[in-house]
Amino acid sequence: MESRGKSASSPKPDTKVPQATAEAKATPAADGKAPLTKPVKKDAQAEKQEQPAAPGPATTKKTPAKADPVLLNNHSNLKPAPTVPAAPSSPDTTSEPKGPGDGAEEDESNTGGRGPWPCENLTPLLVAGGVAVATIALILGVAFLARKK
């Protein structure tokens, strides 16, 4: 039953199904065990070989999506000045230093990488709050132990 489900999803059902049935018929005569273990492994290996082909085009799509850093930093609604035509040469040839505002890190964080926490300003407050709670717990613990004696 599994071979039918997998053969329907595979692109070449005619070539894989006869091989699986031939091996299935050969193994019970020799071992007397269940014949489904070997064909399932071969189907899994065939699926593994097909999967690396799919991520390849996804990585090539990322490379042409580079934008000009000047356009990334421009947050106004105004159109760019007409005197800029000399600047839009390739962005790789510009000698601008890459800083936090050029958008390079922002593009990487959108692809699933771990980006900055949206509440970065809250982090020092959380640390200070944790220290305060630990201090109060320590004081109350010492006071509780001193009262028992």
UniProtKB/Swiss-Prot annotation:
Membrane protein topology class: Single-pass type IV membrane protein
GO terms for cellular component: membrane; mitochondrion; vesicle
Residue ranges, annotated region (Disordered): 1-118
InterPro entries on file: Cend1 (IPR020162)
Biological process terms in GO annotation: adult walking behavior; cerebellar granular layer maturation; cerebellar Purkinje cell differentiation; negative regulation of cerebellar granule cell precursor proliferation; neuron differentiation; radial glia guided migration of cerebellar granule cell
Polar residues composition-biased segments: 1-12
Localization terms from the record: Membrane
Biased composition (Low complexity): 20-35, 80-97
Record field: compositional bias (Basic and acidic residues): 40-50
Positions on the Cytoplasmic side per record topology: 1-125
Pfam families linked to this entry: CEND1
Ranges that cross the membrane: 126-146
Residue intervals on the Extracellular side: 147-149
Entry-annotated residues carrying Phosphoserine: S10, S90, S95
Main subcellular localisation: membrane
Family, as annotated: Belongs to the CEND1 family.
Name of this chain's protein: Cell cycle exit and neuronal differentiation protein 1
Gene responsible for this protein: Cend1
